Amino acid sequence: MITPDVLLPLWEAHRAALDHPVRTLEIDGRVFDDRPYQLGVINLSRDSSYRESIAHDVPAALYRARRMTIEGAAMIDIGAESTGTNADIVDVDGQLATLLPVIDALLADGLLVSVETYLTDVAVAALEAGAQVINLTGRVDDPALYEAVGRHDAGLILCYTPGETARSDVDVPPVDTMIDEQMTFFRDRLDLVAGCGVDKLWIDPGFGFALNLPDGPDRVRYQTDNLLQSFRFRELGWPVCVTMASAVYLFHDEVRVAETAMAVLALLAKANLLRSHEVARVQPVLDMLEICGPGQTP
């Protein structure tokens, strides 16, 4: 059970990380400081398991993006390939055919656009089309990707993946060594990224990407443990992005409110960017914690 008796020793053991300052980022005029924001998700792949987030065409994507922005999203994350086990692999041309018209439409509406991909060619083309952030879901060694991010003065969400990409079916590290594995990954990647001129990024532990995580309660425990410890990445000096897990095992038909619960845990871990399919259900949690607490005037 998650209780103060569990959380307080964790926070005290890593007090330096908990209190560590992180950089303020500015993306195309929008400032992201050390407080929580939402990254609203639009899935352009029909293979996505989160059916409510799917947009089948440009008008649907634009409608969903506008709605999520009104509901509280600071930025919109779009992807053309699902990371699900049975989802089709989509090549560069296929992804760009789906992504580019949506990027154009969202930019024309004045929205901030993040593109989720693990392919260098897709990322570079998205940046050239005007996307302001790349949500990188793979262990890309090619400096061309990072140089393109730096050249366009764009942002980067640097995701940990146990394998080469979010689609890789590999064993995940044991829960008690997971943070150490992730920390090593990020330190190595940050050296590469910094040398390519990238100076706007979020750290994302990527705990939803492992295809062979255990099912049922063990999966939920694994993800929530990693989520609650994600504040430890603050010691790297960059803001932290986390995805709201759906916890289907627990929520069943009420899965659409799962992200509300996960948002509470994310805020306890001082997350800066909450990647959410359910912006309207998550934003009240952010607002409540913003207006409540010691020092707030009734």
Label for each model-derived stretch:
Residues D5, P9, R15-A16, I27, ...:
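Active-site-adjacent loop and "lid" segments of alpha/beta metabolic enzymes
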Residues Y63-G79, A266:
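Catalytic domains of carbohydrate-active enzymes, especially glycoside hydrolases
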Residues M1-T3:
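A general sequence property marking short-to-moderate contiguous segments
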Residues L10-Y37:
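N-terminal carbohydrate-binding accessory modules
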Residues P36-V41, A74-D77, L112-S114, Q132-V133, ...:
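Structural preference for beta-strand elements that scaffold enzyme active sites
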Residues T117:
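Short loop/edge segments at beta-strand edges and connector loops
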